[in-house]
Curated annotation (Swiss-Prot):
GO molecular function ontology, one term from the record: structural constituent of ribosome
Gene3D superfamilies: 2.30.30.790
One Pfam family of this chain: Ribosomal_L19
InterPro entries: Ribosomal_bL19, Ribosomal_bL19_CS, Ribosomal_bL19_sf, Translation_prot_SH3-like_sf
Protein source organism: Xylella fastidiosa (strain Temecula1 / ATCC 700964)
HAMAP family documented for this protein: Ribosomal_bL19
Listed name of the protein: Large ribosomal subunit protein bL19
Role according to the record: This protein is located at the 30S-50S ribosomal subunit interface and may play a role in the structure and function of the aminoacyl-tRNA binding site.
Alphabetized UniProt keyword annotations: Ribonucleoprotein, Ribosomal protein
Example GO BP: translation
Length: 136
């Protein structure tokens, strides 16, 4: 693909990315509010779990969230800029060293826990306090 075509595609993709997505990484526990259509009405469904993988590819970015539902591991892949995603909320920052956490599939119970990144959590709380103090 020529440089001109790549620049045109990059320009188009940047115009399509309209909303801000919070910065999260592997190991973080997040809540994804998804729009679900049932019949003729639409409602929000919360999907809470651990991010086990991310794919950063501009408009085609995606992330995989794993949760345990009724004793079974359930994974769901979300397109980061999909219109069905209403919001993404970060519940907890995890401290991991691997880029992909597929090894969690083989673990269960307490072995599948991820250590919390207390430094990142404290930094975010401090940032929120300063923003609130400036606004108030």
């Amino acid at each position: 693909m020529s440089k001109l075509n790549k620049s045109i595609i990059a320009e188009f993709e940047s115009a399509q990315i309209t909303r801000q997505v919070p910065q999260f990484s592997q190991g973080d526990t997040i809540v994804v509010n998804v729009k679900v259509k049932e019949g003729n009405r639409e409602r929000l469904q919360a999907y809470e779990g651990v991010v086990i993988a991310t794919k950063n590819a501009g408009l085609n970015s995606a992330f995989t969230v794993r949760k345990i539902s009724h004793g079974y591991g359930v994974e769901r892949v979300f397109q980061t800029h999909s219109p069905i995603i209403e919001s993404i909320e970060i519940k907890r920052r995890g401290k991991v060293r691997a880029a992909k956490l597929y090894y969690l599939r083989g673990l269960e119970g307490k072995a599948a826990r991820i250590k919390e990144d207390l430094a990142a959590t404290a930094h975010e709380k401090l940032a929120r306090k300063t923003v609130t103090a400036k606004a108030g």
